[in-house]
């Protein structure tokens, strides 16, 4: 759900966005979130059970952004719970391990599911994680980037271990979500019917202080 806080020019608004991370177990989803929100990294593999979330506050070009980042379990037995966590999401980060071809193929299944449930309004990021293991790569960069382009997503390379590409990933996603929210707001102002915007709950609200970060379980290193 996205909410844009009123009270002045657009540049001074606060946007609240929900972002969900999806992907197989062991690809490093939780490591990415912990590195981004708390600048922490743990080599140990601790499995995420169902889902957890962290929050992050940013200021992008004078626009305040509150992110609620949902980290979901990658195990197959939790797959059916996916819709509970990604409904009303403004952005989705689909993570694969560059050393694991199967994890990349599973990303394609998530993309199909998200497009079916949420249409084209959700901003998609496809992320090749663990680039610190480049010598063990089994997913070609060209293949991954070509696929991302074909489904209207953007492709990124990250390493939670080396803290590479993570800030850029989230910053770019936030900018894209702001642009989408502004388009929805203009459409509402013009009296246009926007089913997608209504589904995601884009609305103008008064600014309210957001709660401090709430941490949950972990996933894999990388």
From Swiss-Prot:
Task: From the UniProt record, list the reaction(s) this protein catalyses.
Answer: GTP + H2O = GDP + phosphate + H(+)
Q: Which Pfam families match?
A: Ras
Cysteine methyl ester sites (modified residues): 219
Disulfide bond positions: none
Annotated GO biological process: anterograde axonal transport; intracellular protein transport; positive regulation of dendrite morphogenesis; positive regulation of early endosome to late endosome transport; positive regulation of receptor-mediated endocytosis; protein stabilization; Rab protein signal transduction; regulation of exocytosis
Which residue ranges run through the membrane? none
Tell me the residue numbers annotated for binding Mg(2+): 30, 48, 71
Q: Where is motif Switch 1 found?
A: 40-53
Activity regulation = Regulated by guanine nucleotide exchange factors (GEFs) including ANKRD27 and RABGEF1, which promote the exchange of bound GDP for free GTP. Regulated by GTPase activating proteins (GAPs) which increase the GTP hydrolysis activity. Inhibited by GDP dissociation inhibitors (GDIs).
Q: Which InterPro entries match?
A: P-loop_NTPase (IPR027417), Rab21 (IPR041833), Small_GTP-bd (IPR005225), Small_GTPase (IPR001806)
Query: For the modification N-acetylalanine, which residues carry it?
Result: 2
Q: Where is the lipid attached (S-geranylgeranyl cysteine)?
A: 218-219
What GO molecular function annotation could you give as one example from this UniProt entry?
A: GTPase activity
Cofactor(s) recorded for this entry are: Mg(2+)
The EC number of this protein is: 3.6.5.2
Where does this polypeptide localize? Endoplasmic reticulum membrane; Golgi apparatus, trans-Golgi network; Golgi apparatus membrane; Early endosome membrane
Q: What is known of its domains?
A: Switch 1, switch 2 and the interswitch regions are characteristic of Rab GTPases and mediate the interactions with Rab downstream effectors. The switch regions undergo conformational changes upon nucleotide binding which drive interaction with specific sets of effector proteins, with most effectors only binding to GTP-bound Rab.
Q: Give the protein's biological function.
A: The small GTPases Rab are key regulators of intracellular membrane trafficking, from the formation of transport vesicles to their fusion with membranes. Rabs cycle between an inactive GDP-bound form and an active GTP-bound form that is able to recruit to membranes different sets of downstream effectors directly responsible for vesicle formation, movement, tethering and fusion. RAB21 is involved in membrane trafficking control. Regulates integrin internalization and recycling, but does not influence the traffic of endosomally translocated receptors in general.
Q: Assembly and partners?
A: Interacts with the cytoplasmic tail of integrins ITGA1, ITGA2, ITGA5, ITGA6, ITGA11 and ITGB1; this interaction is dependent upon its GDP/GTP cycle. Interacts with RABGEF1 (via VPS9 domain). Interacts with ANKRD27. Interacts (in GTP-bound form) with VAMP8 in response to starvation; the interaction probably regulates VAMP8 endolysosomal trafficking. Interacts (active GTP-bound form) with TMED10; the interaction is indirect and regulates TMED10 abundance and localization at the Golgi.
Q: Which family does it belong to?
A: Belongs to the small GTPase superfamily. Rab family.
Q: What is this protein called?
A: Ras-related protein Rab-21
Species of origin reads Bos taurus
Upper lineage is: Eukaryota, Metazoa, Chordata, Craniata, Vertebrata
């Amino acid at each position: 759900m996205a909410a844009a806080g009123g009270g002045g020019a657009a540049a001074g608004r606060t946007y609240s966005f929900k972002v969900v991370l999806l992907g197989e177990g062991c690809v490093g989803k939780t490591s990415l979130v912990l590195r981004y929100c708390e600048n922490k990294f743990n080599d140990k593999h601790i499995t995420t059970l169902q889902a957890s979330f962290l929050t992050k506050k940013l200021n992008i070009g004078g626009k305040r952004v509150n992110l609620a980042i949902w980290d979901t379990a990658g195990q197959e037995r939790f797959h059916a719970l996916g819709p509970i966590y990604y409904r009303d999401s403004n952005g989705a980060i689909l993570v694969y391990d560059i050393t694991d071809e199967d994890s990349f193929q599973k990303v394609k299944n998530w993309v199909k599911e998200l497009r079916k449930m949420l249409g084209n309004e959700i901003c998609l990021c496809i992320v090749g994680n663990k680039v610190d293991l480049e010598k063990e790569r089994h997913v070609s960069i060209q293949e991954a980037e070509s696929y991302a382009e074909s489904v209207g997503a953007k492709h990124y390379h990250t390493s939670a271990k080396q803290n590479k590409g993570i800030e850029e990933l989230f910053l770019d996603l936030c900018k894209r979500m702001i642009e989408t929210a502004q388009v929805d707001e203009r459409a509402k102002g013009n009296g246009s019917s926007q089913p997608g915007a209504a589904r995601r709950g884009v609305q103008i609200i008064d600014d309210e202080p957001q709660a401090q970060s709430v941490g949950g379980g972990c996933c894999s290193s990388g």
